[in-house]
Curated annotation (Swiss-Prot):
Organism from which the protein derives: Aeropyrum pernix (strain ATCC 700893 / DSM 11879 / JCM 9820 / NBRC 100138 / K1)
Location of the region described as N-domain in the Swiss-Prot/TrEMBL record: 1-101
Xref: InterPro entries: 5-3_exonuclease_C_sf, Flap_endonuc, Flap_endonuc_arc, HhH2, PIN-like_dom_sf, XPG-I_dom, XPG/Rad2, XPG_CS
UniProt keyword annotations, A-Z: DNA damage, DNA repair, DNA replication, Endonuclease, Exonuclease, Hydrolase, Magnesium, Metal-binding, Nuclease
One BP annotation, GO: DNA replication, removal of RNA primer
Quaternary assembly: Interacts with PCNA. PCNA stimulates the nuclease activity without altering cleavage specificity.
Record bears the keyword DNA damage: yes
Protein name according to UniProt: Flap endonuclease 1
Pfam families cross-referenced by the UniProt entry: XPG_I, XPG_N
Protein residues bound to Mg(2+) 2: 176, 178, 239
Annotated positions binding Mg(2+) 1: 30, 83, 155, 157
Chain segments carrying region I-domain: 119-261
Cited function: Structure-specific nuclease with 5'-flap endonuclease and 5'-3' exonuclease activities involved in DNA replication and repair. During DNA replication, cleaves the 5'-overhanging flap structure that is generated by displacement synthesis when DNA polymerase encounters the 5'-end of a downstream Okazaki fragment. Binds the unpaired 3'-DNA end and kinks the DNA to facilitate 5' cleavage specificity. Cleaves one nucleotide into the double-stranded DNA from the junction in flap DNA, leaving a nick for ligation. Also involved in the base excision repair (BER) pathway.
């Protein structure tokens, strides 16, 4: 779920763009975040995910395949970063997510029995699960498509932020804001699904475009440092301290941090209750120094079309004609947008 910084981000630090504005940039994408979005959004009207003849879920593969092609056709260079072992501090959040999914599954079944299609779809989306088999097959598909991916030792967003700080990527891509706390110079949101999107439970659509958020303009406008932003995030609540510190919203958290200045003083001021200040200091240190790796190579290779056909058509019953048309697009995008092309290094703002 991540930290919610949306209310604090000033207009000066964010802007909506068309996909083509990101052409030439390497983007380190939070793979789990993207795959969950595909599993949630790519469903039939009753909420059922896409399935092959054996009943295996394929929504994630469909989203990954076609969306990646859309990105590279625009000249974007996606690098998918996969989560490793979650830190022990995240166990409470993981357990809570499992509980919520189990509850959503039960409500989904009741809605189906009652013939409530809209309710069934809503709860089916909430119950989406990403299994280890899905993750491994996603990596296999990316290999076949010639797309690079990186295995993070722990949090994918931390690894993606590290790659962006090093200059190996221009920005991180995720719906969550955590990568800003991890120090990513830029965050791009709304990459998995763009265009018109129906609001859940309402007969209303909104236009979704990619959104760029830059860390330095954000910090400058708020008048704080990255370390202080981490303290704000902890007060609001992160995956490592769900719910945050009682009584603090975005404005009150920012006010306290600016008043006390030193993040250690901020965390020490928290009343001993649900979260001990010593524990919160560990969370703070994790955002500053998460486990990351330099064991990766960003290389875009010629697609192995036969392997893609094997995975999608032979194994998972994808429509062969549609896959062939997509492979033609992928091959053309590789030749014209990826092969031998240098990445853009210029800054977006400024």
């Amino acid at each position: 779920m991540g930290v919610n910084l949306r209310e604090l981000i000033p207009p000066e630090a964010r802007r909506e763009v068309e996909l083509r504005a990101l052409s030439g940039y390497v983007l380190a994408l939070d793979a789990y975040n993207m795959l969950y979005q595909f599993l949630t959004a790519i469903r039939q009207p009753d909420g059922t995910p896409l399935l092959d003849r054996e009943g295996r879920v394929t929504s994630h593969l469909s989203g990954l395949f076609y969306r990646t092609i859309n990105l590279v056709e625009e000249g974007i260079k996606p690098v998918y970063v996969f989560d490793g072992k979650p830190p022990e501090m995240k166990s409470r959040e993981v357990e809570e997510r499992l509980r919520r999914k189990a509850e959503a599954e039960a409500r989904y079944r009741r809605a189906v029995e009652a013939g409530e299609v809209e309710e069934a779809r809503k709860y089916a989306m909430m119950a989406a699960r990403l299994t280890s088999d899905m993750v491994e097959e996603s990596k296999e598909l990316l290999d076949a498509m010639g797309m690079p991916w990186v295995q993070a030792p722990a949090e994918g967003e931390a690894q993606a932020a590290y790659m962006a700080r090093k200059g190996d990527a221009w920005a991180t891509g995720s719906q969550d804001y955590d990568s800003l706390l991890f120090g990513s110079p830029r965050l791009v949101r709304n990459l998995a699904i763009t265009g018109r999107r129906k609001l859940p439970g309402r007969d209303q659509y909104v236009e979704i475009k990619p959104e760029i958020i830059e860390l330095e303009p954000l910090l400058s406008k708020l008048g704080i440092t990255r370390e202080q932003l981490i303290a704000v995030g902890i007060l609001l609540g992160t995956d490592y301290n769900p719910g945050g510190v009682r009584g603090y919203g975005p404005k009150t958290a920012l006010r306290l941090v600016k008043s006390l200045g030193d993040p250690m003083k901020v965390l020490a001021s928290v009343p001993r209750g649900e979260y001990d200040p010593d524990y919160l200091r560990k969370v703070y240190e994790y955002f500053l120094n998460p486990p990351v790796t330099d064991d990766y190579k960003i290389e875009f290779r010629k697609p192995d079309q036969d392997k893609v056909r094997e995975i999608l058509v032979e194994r998972h019953d994808f429509n062969p004609e549609r896959v062939e048309r997509a492979l033609e697009r992928l091959g053309k995008a590789y030749r014209e947008k990826l092969r031998g092309r240098q990445s853009r290094l210029d800054m977006w703002f400024g």
